[in-house]
């Protein structure tokens, strides 16, 4: 598991994600992003199973970026599936203007 040592915010955002699940089916859903940093977040509320290394699109406030899935967990709770994501190098963080202090 990767460990990041950068500032994170305790705030959360509703974001739209899309990509292909582990069966190859396209999906598009709204989930909650928390533990937000300049280069990643923890997504909660996913209803689709993903794989480590999958690349998904994350949209927030009219901006869209690609992230790599670096950690997954089926929470077996109202959080459904959780995924830690990390921003791809060539991308710009979609929530950067929302959390300037991050």
Model-derived segments and spans:
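Structured alpha-helical
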Residues: 1-102
